[in-house]
């Protein structure tokens, strides 16, 4: 079993599709079909085999597990998470990050005082949005760009933003 630190979440089963045990897979890879080119494992580190059937008109992946053949079996998989080993992923460029590495990352102001953490990373189609949870437990959505986050390391992110500006 691999520790969750060594696993990167790359997909989640959204729902079943049809009567033959197919599932709709929400892929977090870019492009989305790249998920089927990776060796996938579950949370316990056990190998998972899926086959891509097609990509639908919404861009979702229709897939099938080797050992799932009915709609009822597929329906039970809703929310099932798929991971790949961190070691199997390509080396990242200097300003690239895996979402899992940014979640809960401390956020500092320009004086290096902790002011909150990254709660979530969202994308609604126009670019990544960072959900920031401040120390007072309030949250704000901010664009993920160099203007707002000029410095990001594996240990912290600097936020260039005064809360009363917006």
From Swiss-Prot:
Keywords: Chaperone, Cytoplasm, Ribosome biogenesis, rRNA processing. GO terms for biological process: ribosomal small subunit biogenesis; rRNA processing. Residues 94-166 form the PRC barrel domain. One of its GO terms (cellular component) is cytoplasm. It comes from the Bacteria. It is found in: Cytoplasm. It holds the Pfam family RimM. Transmembrane segments: none annotated. The keyword DNA-binding does not apply. GO terms for molecular function: ribosome binding. Binds ribosomal protein uS19. Belongs to the RimM family. An accessory protein needed during the final step in the assembly of 30S ribosomal subunit, possibly for assembly of the head region. Essential for efficient processing of 16S rRNA. May be needed both before and after RbfA during the maturation of 16S rRNA. It has affinity for free ribosomal 30S subunits but not for 70S ribosomes. The PRC barrel domain binds ribosomal protein uS19. This is Ribosome maturation factor RimM. It comes from Rickettsia bellii (strain RML369-C). The gene is rimM.
């Amino acid at each position: 079993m691999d520790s969750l630190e060594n696993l990167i979440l790359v997909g989640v089963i959204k729902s079943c599709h049809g009567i033959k045990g197919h599932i709709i897979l929400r892929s977090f890879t870019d492009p989305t079909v790249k998920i089927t080119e990776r060796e996938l494992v579950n949370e316990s580190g056990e190998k998972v085999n899926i086959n891509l059937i097609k990509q639908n008109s919404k861009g979702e992946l229709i897939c099938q597990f080797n050992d799932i053949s009915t709609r009822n079996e597929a329906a039970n998989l809703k929310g099932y998470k798929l991971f790949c080993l961190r070691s199997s992923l390509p080396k990242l460029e200097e300003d690239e990050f895996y979402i899992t590495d940014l979640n809960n990352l401390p956020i500092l102001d320009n004086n290096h005082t902790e002011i909150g953490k990254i709660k979530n990373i969202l994308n609604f189609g126009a670019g990544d949005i960072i959900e920031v949870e401040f120390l007072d437990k309030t949250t704000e959505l901010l664009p993920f760009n160099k203007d707002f986050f000029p410095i990001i390391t594996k240990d912290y992110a600097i936020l260039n933003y005064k809360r009363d500006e917006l």
